[in-house]
């Protein structure tokens, strides 16, 4: 069967409305790295200040992280850290 070379496949990834807090942190981290930012510093800046301009709009990361409250994100980070030990 011959493939239609004029057709472009599109991979959607994880739908934004189904992302967990952990998935969101990973997604935003990767978007920040792709844009050349220090992701740890940028995420800390956002969590401390609430200023979403610390998060890139690349890949819609800024809008995605704002779907969660900052305390939910901190809870996920701390829980993940404590469960590693």
Curated annotation (Swiss-Prot):
List the PANTHER family.
UPF0297 PROTEIN YRZL
The organism's place on the tree of life at top rank: Bacteria
Name the cystine pairs.
Answer: none
Similarity comment text for this entry: Belongs to the UPF0297 family.
- Pfam families documented for this protein: IreB
> What is the protein named?
UPF0297 protein CD630_12830
